Amino acid sequence: MLRFENLSKRYSERIIFQGLHYDTAAGCVALNDESGSGKSTLLSILAGTIEADTGEVWLGGHSLRSASHNAKSVLTYVPEDCMAYPDQTGREYLNRLASQRNTVLDSQALDLASRFGLDQHLDKRFEQMSFGTRKKIFLTGATLGETKVVIADEPAGGLDASARAVLVDLFKTLAETRTVFFSSYDAAFVQACEAKTIGFADLGAVADERG
């Protein structure tokens, strides 16, 4: 469901990474490497928010380069700082996301929002929300539509213990039918998600997890 080949990125004269390859189907994969290694840059490339210098990404079998609309239609992306439009409410964001995915804000998503403790926050504007509340809004959006890939940058950051427990359940459920690819330094969270842990050293050659 998530595949990338020969990804490289540099800023000016600094090489962030080069020649990265990976191929994985349903399941949780946690990217854990040292600070400054390029984890957020890689996740942004996989989500299509920045471009790689070389290489290609496929989401749900769709090329992010040549079929961007189709690729992004099967993607949920949760950046580290989940700021949508500052004056947009959480409910408006979720309704817009549902519309983009040809679905509606259904009882499943609203139940997840409630479990995240968002009942009193859905009608607040993003600029009024805390860091953790914004993140929970974005994570709730992962249940909307028929997405195949979830990419998340430090998804447990800013969440309290009860929200982390909800997130673990969410990721384990999503991983039954989708790829959940996230970065995290939190070994306990990664273990609770039953995620496979990889580093950049594991991305230097094709690693096939489809078996």
Question: PLM features: residue spans?
Answer:
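Catalytic Walker B motif of ABC-type/P-loop ATPase nucleotide-binding domains
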Residues: 150-154
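ABC ATPase C-loop
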Residues: 143-144
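Q-loop/switch helix immediately C-terminal to the Walker
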Residues: 81, 86-102
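Conserved ABC transporter NBD signature motif
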Residues: 55-66, 70-71
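Helix-to-loop junction immediately C-terminal to a conserved catalytic motif
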Residues: 47
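Conserved ABC ATPase "signature" region
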Residues: 95, 106-121
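Hydrophobic anchor residue at the start of the ABC signature
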Residues: 139-140
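A short, flexible loop at the N-terminus of ABC-type nucleotide-binding domains that lies
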Residues: 1-26, 68
